[in-house]
Amino acid sequence: MLLDHILKPRAVAVVGASTRPHTIGNDLLKRLLEYGFKGHIYPVNPKGGEIEGLRAYTSVNELPDGVDLAVIVVNAKFVLSTVDACAALGIKGLVVISAGFKETGGEGRQLEEALAAKVRANGMRMVGPNCLGVVNTNPNVRLDACFAESLPVAGDIGFVSQSGALGGGILNILKDLNVGFAQFISIGNQADVNAETALEYWENDPDVKQILLYMESIPDPANFRKLATRISKKKPIVALKAGRSAAGACLLYTSDAAD
């Protein structure tokens, strides 16, 4: 289905996994392990060896078949070649945590355009770049590929946020209130997957019974309105659109590249 490779993967590769504590590449790997992901986990680090008790593969090309999702945390200049390697292996789901794209302007914008084109050309789906990651609390999945401060308790809400900071803040607040989530998607620069993609996916996902959206830009307002009108007849939707003032829009552009 639309986002199954990302939200319900059977195997996850962490490209840019690290042995160094308190780095994103190490924290993400540990969170996958500690949350009890039900599938296989493959760290990728050019030095190889072992990371958090798992064999580290020196490149994506070394990975076994059957990887659904690659969580990419390498430097932005290496992301395109990493995506090429993922495509060659048949990996269809990508979460690009790495920053350094449209939010930096100029060359970063061009790099993101090339990234999005490569994803489309290979029939892949991508969350990000410049995002916190994704979570699925379903006990048969147990996916925590996210570096938000708080992990939501299990529930029936699907939550998508363009802002990493605000998304993480909402998770903190609602965790304190014991409000549970089924799935969380931090879309970041939304070069591919956006709020509309999430709405379409969650429309028929039995795990998600309520939908919460925080958006700073809507690429196709007419299509969003059409989707939201249709889906809200089945599941309640709460949507917050920020950045309405000129000052707010400027601030949002520098944080998550909202257009």
Residue ranges and their predicted role:
Residues M1-S255:
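Catalytic-core regions of core metabolic enzymes
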